[in-house]
Amino acid sequence: MIDRYKHQQLRIGSVSPQQISAWANKILPNGEIIGEVTKPYTFHYKTNKPEKDGLFCERIFGPIKSGICACGNYRVIGDEKDDPKFCEQCGVEFVDSRIRRYQMGYIKLACPVTHVWYLKRLPSYIANLLDKPLKELEGLVYCDFSFARPIEKKPTFLRLRGSFEYEIQSWKYSIPLFFTTQGFDTFRNREISTGAGAIREQLDDLDLRIIIDYSLVEWKELGEEGPTGNEWEDRKIGRRKDFLVRRMELAKHFIRTNIEPEWMVLCLLPVLPPELRPIIQIDGGKLMSSDINELYRRVIYRNNTLTDLLTTSRSTPGELVMCQEKLVQEAVDTLLDNGIRGQPMRDGHNKVYKSFSDVIEGKEGRFRETLLGKRVDYSGRSVIVVGPSLSLHQCGLPREIAIELFQTFLIRGLIRQHLASNIGVAKSQIREKEPIVWEILQEVMRGHPVLLNRAPTLHRLGIQAFQPILVEGRAICLHPLVRKGFNADFDGDQMAVHVPLSLEAQSEARLLMFSHMNLLSPAIGDPISVPTQDMLIGLYVLTSGNRRGICANRYNPCNRRNYQNERIDDNNYRYTKEKEPFFCNSYDAIGAYRHKRINLYSPLWLRWQLDQRLIASKEAPIEVHYESLGTYHEIYGHYLIVRSVKKEIPCIYIRTTVGHISLYREIEEAIQGFCRACSYET
């Protein structure tokens, strides 16, 4: 349905019998009303055409072929001539065959039938409204015992108003035998009620507002009593109070949605459109049918049998009628939810029939498979791995996935740049994976974000936008900082990638869904892009060099032997820890590390900017090195000061490692990038 704001929505609930008939009924030009399915047949075995008034009737559900009736006559759909809309011979409407996807029918039940979802599902809505135990209601619905029916302002023979017959044990077996005697039909119908009809009468007599008032009064009385001191009694009172709250909420829901309680008992059973329960012909002429068709046939067979028994009620024993009503109830239960009452119904191959509940519920049901989690175009899925070289807003997309997702954009780019004359030539170039294809693909991807989603999407950070980058392999590369938002781990987790097509979707992805714009948790406001797991280990490895300073390392007698043995040999350079190298800038230090002249933890001296805090420090140097030109080096625990002959300070060196330098450069670049972004916004 579509609301006043033009939002498409789906509402599931009870409907009245009048609404069910309005969905299905059609009036022919001769005044005949069609819509009721009365025959359990599907297709005629000779003509292979739908049976009239059957489960695939063209009069009820529409033509199989657009504009062609059952007689074979053809008429243009939407023709403005004054030709009749229905065929005069067969009564089939000249409409599009797609009507068979939504045109419904109905089965007029010979007796009321309780909807098993409202009776057997927990909590039982019928039991809550009637304030009766579920076991008693089940016995009444399935004709295991009877109910004394009070007639308004008239005394009954039993004088039992609203009580179950089992309450009087001496009458438990005598009442059914007495009132099912032949010739007592009128008397029996006046005094005894059983089956779903008894439930319907009680639901029809309910006043929901009175239920709310009485339940509220009882709840207050129980609350005022206080604890009794008996644990069992206190639990019983607590359960009763919880039940009263659920009962009031249920009654309010019925009032708010304009649903009558008696609608939970069916008089008309809706029949699904034929296209939703198809019969398909496979190789060899064999037919494959939906299980729902067989369950519908079972209902129609039993309902027609009950109708025949009721039309000849004078010669039919009452117990036989009650047993047939029970069979109709069980057939409808199997159609709606097979196996809810115990042993499910099976076919000849011992396979359980799929009921209506099985079709719509679960991971492979109608909602989750075809509406909520259905397969969509321009999407793919792969395993995620760490992409340490990526920016926060980037993701690595495998070439194999990218060339499929962006194929239409790639074809357009090849044709626009006159690299392909038509679509066929462009597809041929893509299949051959020519070098120009990858260049055009990179241009297409440069301004087109993609969406990454990890199921289950429990909050809005479960799907975020990224700028795709082509990578080798078959795994999607992801920045480790966005892992927490997706609640993902790099141990085999899979993620889906989607391509937003419209300009509106791309704008929304850029403005609202980019990963670098979702740094805080929407629930509590804490930072969600924080280093964890591998990143913490990496930070520890980068900064795990000796931090005890030169005094503890060089002059510790326990470590002096290690200094003699620990060295890095290279063809052009020889370094020992007793001779720590000097570097003018961080680029030289990282270059030496990449050429394997020093390792990640090797202490070194890095020239640093003059710092007044170090110059003004009153710390005494550990040692002083004098040079021949008169300059000298004052060596401290973590830094070194170079002084001239005039005691001026031309430069300062700090003692660090390549790991510390790399971490500092990353932090510095991040701060500079943030400052540039802030300056652009202002």
Curated annotation (Swiss-Prot):
Binding site residues for Zn(2+): 69, 71, 87, 90
Gene name in the database record: rpoC1
Presence of keyword Nucleotidyltransferase: yes
Keywords: Chloroplast, DNA-directed RNA polymerase, Magnesium, Metal-binding, Nucleotidyltransferase, Plastid, Transcription, Transferase, Zinc
Role summary: DNA-dependent RNA polymerase catalyzes the transcription of DNA into RNA using the four ribonucleoside triphosphates as substrates.
Transmembrane segments: none
Protein name: DNA-directed RNA polymerase subunit beta'
Annotated Pfam families: RNA_pol_Rpb1_1 (PF04997), RNA_pol_Rpb1_2 (PF00623)
Organism per entry: Vitis vinifera
EC number: 2.7.7.6
UniProt family annotation: Belongs to the RNA polymerase beta' chain family. RpoC1 subfamily.
